[in-house]
């Protein structure tokens, strides 16, 4: 890497190399988010933790406010900075306006912060892609994704990180079924099935959270994940038998 690659204002062919390096860091994990009429489900691939490690300190789904959560793919240390900044901004909004911040407001705040770091001297872009899900005051479910470059989009279902294209193929292939998802259980199954395409079928490697309107964020228990994985295994066997000549 030449010294020009490290500069924030020298580039060629429209490529910001530092941003592209940050995009590569995002490939260190996989996340999936799905929005239905009743809930928002966030799922993330995680490494198995040591038996002596406290589980809550390694979680990759973080609460931003009572009605909002965020998960991420990329550098965990960078993500913790963004989570902390988002939490402070959400609480500041409550104190100043006596109402919760909208999901898009926090997403815009994070996107603006990320974009600022692509133009700052002696700083590097955040190597994190975030999925932010939650509910607005009117009960509308929202799901947003931000990139290291600072751009953001809203989605009904999306994935970021490692094998993102493979997971997206599953989501696009099952768009009709996902759009008709009636409840949280069905939504959770779709998210776990999507993560299954990117990771081993093991409850210890998956973290799942469900957000509902005016309800506490639910972190899905390992027993529930075990049950969902059992259902998915059975469905996979049935599909294989159906396709067999």
Curated annotation (Swiss-Prot):
Transmembrane annotation, as ranges: none
InterPro entries: Ntn_hydrolases_N (IPR029055), Proteasome_alpha (IPR050115), Proteasome_alpha-type (IPR023332), Proteasome_asu_N (IPR000426), Proteasome_sua/b (IPR001353)
Distribution of this protein across tissues and organs: Testis specific.
Keywords attached to this entry: Cytoplasm, Nucleus, Proteasome
Cellular location(s): Cytoplasm; Nucleus
Function of the molecule: The proteasome is a multicatalytic proteinase complex which is characterized by its ability to cleave peptides with Arg, Phe, Tyr, Leu, and Glu adjacent to the leaving group at neutral or slightly basic pH. The proteasome has an ATP-dependent proteolytic activity.
Binding partners and assembly: The 26S proteasome consists of a 20S proteasome core and two 19S regulatory subunits. The 20S proteasome core is composed of 28 subunits that are arranged in four stacked rings, resulting in a barrel-shaped structure. The two end rings are each formed by seven alpha subunits, and the two central rings are each formed by seven beta subunits. The catalytic chamber with the active sites is on the inside of the barrel.
PANTHER family: PROTEASOME SUBUNIT ALPHA/BETA (PTHR11599)
Protein name: Proteasome subunit alpha type-7-1B
